[in-house]
């Protein structure tokens, strides 16, 4: 039978609950426990699939095609365990389910209320993850901050959860902030005390406190916090600001988080094996020469919009003993100022996914620059589509060529709508989503990188390469190196004779892991590293 851990947050938003939950998952897995993590998001959207990246950040896609919160990406990367649509719960999806049940008559004419019906649905979702994941421990992160009105049904649900399982079968972990006041020269505990007081007023007494701070917490302060908040001093776990999110599990292990959780859950504290993770962090902190990578996007003002892409680049750099020198380039600035001025000196260019017209011409200009300057390039989703448009306009001479998404009346729709998408009306959850197989061409760069003939990748798109232009594409020096098993859909392209020019319709960033980087990103960083000076004299020559 599964045990349950609930992670709440107080004082401020974005305090790092997701990283704490993911880190705890890593620590439990290092002791041999099977783990699943789910996120309860208190917004009324059914899922984040139709939300603006500027408001929500990245949409992370699971194997089974759920569009979810970016925290699920952290869960997967830290635990190296695939999550599913069951691991993402929103207030919108909960209410939708309850209302659908009411319309079907499932409640036998009863009055439908927040308690017990909404809270009961939330509890059922948590139990469903436990039943379907075969996990020893299910960790649930509650979005928002204690005190928010939106989070109240979730907090009530996890309070009620005590009645579903034994007291030794669940633990409450509260993440809080200890702000430092410079004029008094001390960390302040009052916000934490009030946050715990608010949680207690709902009926939840935290078992463990994870205290964020920008400086060390001494034993005296831990004892004070524990005394005021009703937790043992040993259950006050410091969480000092870290130089990398991948260092957080190591810090929380030293602080005793996992041991305290296991103690509350009456589980055995097996020997932890974090050696490979610690080695990874050491490599991250002691990298080799830096590679300059330009990420050319539409949403660069909010870095979280491309979170998995950035993490995939980091994973590849760790593997290649390189430091990542990431340059955020707004595609619209390239439209205004030209590609050369913004991209000159870059060792690699990445064009990630996106939707809509804005910034597309800037992406196309960046791809042309990478092609002509022979700079390693990787295109993802829209990045592949814009690479095809760049080919059509500048190599094939197809005047006005573009995507039917961007200009439905174009005479050369080199990217067009998938046939099965023709009659789709709703935007949410209706794209080509989730894992699909891709057959690679023997002898291609992609086949060399993957080392396999068939790979499985995650998708999120409606538009695809138009096969009416396939022969012309192949005749102009390009190769279609990955297709769907039936050969109908173009999934991966590359340019022959170029140091590294690959673009895929799928999202390889979702499958990259710290200890298992994705081959397409590893190949990009390896190719970028080849551009670095190989000796001091070469470095002087280049600077000159």
From Swiss-Prot:
<dbReference type="Pfam" id="PF06418">
    <property type="entry name" value="CTP_synth_N"/>
</dbReference>
<dbReference type="InterPro" id="IPR017456">
    <property type="entry name" value="CTP_synthase_N"/>
</dbReference>
<feature type="binding site">
    <location>
        <position position="13"/>
    </location>
    <ligand>
        <name>CTP</name>
    </ligand>
</feature>
<keyword id="KW-0665">Pyrimidine biosynthesis</keyword>
<keyword id="KW-0315">Glutamine amidotransferase</keyword>
<comment type="pathway">
    <text>Pyrimidine metabolism; CTP biosynthesis via de novo pathway; CTP from UDP: step 2/2.</text>
</comment>
<dbReference type="GO" id="GO:0003883">
    <property type="term" value="F:CTP synthase activity"/>
</dbReference>
<comment type="subunit">
    <text>Homotetramer.</text>
</comment>
<dbReference type="InterPro" id="IPR004468">
    <property type="entry name" value="CTP_synthase"/>
</dbReference>
<feature type="binding site">
    <location>
        <position position="141"/>
    </location>
    <ligand>
        <name>Mg(2+)</name>
    </ligand>
</feature>
<feature type="binding site">
    <location>
        <begin position="14"/>
        <end position="19"/>
    </location>
    <ligand>
        <name>ATP</name>
    </ligand>
</feature>
<keyword id="KW-0436">Ligase</keyword>
<feature type="binding site">
    <location>
        <begin position="188"/>
        <end position="193"/>
    </location>
    <ligand>
        <name>UTP</name>
    </ligand>
</feature>
<dbReference type="InterPro" id="IPR017926">
    <property type="entry name" value="GATASE"/>
</dbReference>
<feature type="binding site">
    <location>
        <position position="354"/>
    </location>
    <ligand>
        <name>L-glutamine</name>
    </ligand>
</feature>
<comment type="similarity">
    <text>Belongs to the CTP synthase family.</text>
</comment>
<feature type="binding site">
    <location>
        <position position="405"/>
    </location>
    <ligand>
        <name>L-glutamine</name>
    </ligand>
</feature>
<dbReference type="InterPro" id="IPR027417">
    <property type="entry name" value="P-loop_NTPase"/>
</dbReference>
<dbReference type="InterPro" id="IPR029062">
    <property type="entry name" value="Class_I_gatase-like"/>
</dbReference>
<dbReference type="GO" id="GO:0019856">
    <property type="term" value="P:pyrimidine nucleobase biosynthetic process"/>
</dbReference>
<keyword id="KW-0067">ATP-binding</keyword>
<feature type="binding site">
    <location>
        <position position="224"/>
    </location>
    <ligand>
        <name>CTP</name>
    </ligand>
</feature>
<feature type="region of interest" description="Amidoligase domain">
    <location>
        <begin position="1"/>
        <end position="267"/>
    </location>
</feature>
<dbReference type="GO" id="GO:0042802">
    <property type="term" value="F:identical protein binding"/>
</dbReference>
<dbReference type="GO" id="GO:0005524">
    <property type="term" value="F:ATP binding"/>
</dbReference>
<feature type="binding site">
    <location>
        <begin position="382"/>
        <end position="385"/>
    </location>
    <ligand>
        <name>L-glutamine</name>
    </ligand>
</feature>
<feature type="active site">
    <location>
        <position position="509"/>
    </location>
</feature>
<comment type="function">
    <text>Catalyzes the ATP-dependent amination of UTP to CTP with either L-glutamine or ammonia as the source of nitrogen. Regulates intracellular CTP levels through interactions with the four ribonucleotide triphosphates.</text>
</comment>
<feature type="domain" description="Glutamine amidotransferase type-1">
    <location>
        <begin position="292"/>
        <end position="534"/>
    </location>
</feature>
<feature type="binding site">
    <location>
        <position position="224"/>
    </location>
    <ligand>
        <name>UTP</name>
    </ligand>
</feature>
<keyword id="KW-0547">Nucleotide-binding</keyword>
<dbReference type="Pfam" id="PF00117">
    <property type="entry name" value="GATase"/>
</dbReference>
<feature type="active site">
    <location>
        <position position="507"/>
    </location>
</feature>
<keyword id="KW-0460">Magnesium</keyword>
<feature type="active site" description="Nucleophile; for glutamine hydrolysis">
    <location>
        <position position="381"/>
    </location>
</feature>
<dbReference type="GO" id="GO:0044210">
    <property type="term" value="P:'de novo' CTP biosynthetic process"/>
</dbReference>
<feature type="binding site">
    <location>
        <position position="71"/>
    </location>
    <ligand>
        <name>ATP</name>
    </ligand>
</feature>
<feature type="binding site">
    <location>
        <position position="462"/>
    </location>
    <ligand>
        <name>L-glutamine</name>
    </ligand>
</feature>
<protein>
    <recommendedName>
        <fullName>CTP synthase</fullName>
        <ecNumber>6.3.4.2</ecNumber>
    </recommendedName>
</protein>
<dbReference type="InterPro" id="IPR033828">
    <property type="entry name" value="GATase1_CTP_Synthase"/>
</dbReference>
<feature type="binding site">
    <location>
        <position position="71"/>
    </location>
    <ligand>
        <name>Mg(2+)</name>
    </ligand>
</feature>
<dbReference type="GO" id="GO:0004359">
    <property type="term" value="F:glutaminase activity"/>
</dbReference>
């Amino acid at each position: 039978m599964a045990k349950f851990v609930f992670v709440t947050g107080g004082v401020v938003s974005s305090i790092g609950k997701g990283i704490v939950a993911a880190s705890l998952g890593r620590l439990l897995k290092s002791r041999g426990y099977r783990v699943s993590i789910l996120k309860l998001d208190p917004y009324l959207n059914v899922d984040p699939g139709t939300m603006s990246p500027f408001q929500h950040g990245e949409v992370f896609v699971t194997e089974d095609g759920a569009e979810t919160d970016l925290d699920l990406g952290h869960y997967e990367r830290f635990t190296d365990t695939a999550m599913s649509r069951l691991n993402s719960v929103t207030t919108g999806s909960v209410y939708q389910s309850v209302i659908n049940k009411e319309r079907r008559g499932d409640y036998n004419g009863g009055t439908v209320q927040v308690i017990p019906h909404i809270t009961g649905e939330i509890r059922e979702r948590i139990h469903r993850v436990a039943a379907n994941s075969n996990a020893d421990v299910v960790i649930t992160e509650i979005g928002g901050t204690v005190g928010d009105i939106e989070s109240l049904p979730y907090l009530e649900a996890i309070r009620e959860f005590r009645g579903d399982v034994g007291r030794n079968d669940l633990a409450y972990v509260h993440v809080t902030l200890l702000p430092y006041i410079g004029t008094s020269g001390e960390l302040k505990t009052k916000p934490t005390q009030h946050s715990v007081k608010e949680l207690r007023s709902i009926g939840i007494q935290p078992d463990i406190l994870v205290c964020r701070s920008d400086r060390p917490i001494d034993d005296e302060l831990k004892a004070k916090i524990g005394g005021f908040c009703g937790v043992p001093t040993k259950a006050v776990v410091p969480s000092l600001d870290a130089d990398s999110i991948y260092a957080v599990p190591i810090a929380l292990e030293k602080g005793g988080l996992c041991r305290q959780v296991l103690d509350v859950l009456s589980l055995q504290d097996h020997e932890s094996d974090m050696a490979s993770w610690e080695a990874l962090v050491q490599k991250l902190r002691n990298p080799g020469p830096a590679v300059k990578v330009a990420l050319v996007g539409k949403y660069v003002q909010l870095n979280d919009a491309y979170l998995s892409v950035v993490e995939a680049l980091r994973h590849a750099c760790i593997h290649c003993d390189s430091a990542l020198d990431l340059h955020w380039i707004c595609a619209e600035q390239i439209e205004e100022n030209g590609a050369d001025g913004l991209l000159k000196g870059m060792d690699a260019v990445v064009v990630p996914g996106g939707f809509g017209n804005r910034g597309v011409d800037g992406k196309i200009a960046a791809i042309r620059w990478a092609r002509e300057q022979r700079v390693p390039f990787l295109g993802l989703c829209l990045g592949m589509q814009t690479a095809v448009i760049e080919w059509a306009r500048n190599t094939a001479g197809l005047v006005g060529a573009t995507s039917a998404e961007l200009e439905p009346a174009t005479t050369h729709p080199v990217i067009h709508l998938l046939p099965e998408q023709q009659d789709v009306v709703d935007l949410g959850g209706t794209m080509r989503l989730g894992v699909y197989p891709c057959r690679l061409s023997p002898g291609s760069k992609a086949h060399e990188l993957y080392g396999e003939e068939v790979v499985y990748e995650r998708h999120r798109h409606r538009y695809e390469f138009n096969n009416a232009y396939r022969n012309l594409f192949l005749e102009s020096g390009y190769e279609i190196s990955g297709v769907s098993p039936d050969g109908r859909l173009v999934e991966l392209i590359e340019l022959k004779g170029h140091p590294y020019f690959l673009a895929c319709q799928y999202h390889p960033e979702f499958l990259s892991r710290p200890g298992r980087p994705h081959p397409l990103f590893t190949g990009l960083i390896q190719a970028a590293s080849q551009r670095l000076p190989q000796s001091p004299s070469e470095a002087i020559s280049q600077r000159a």
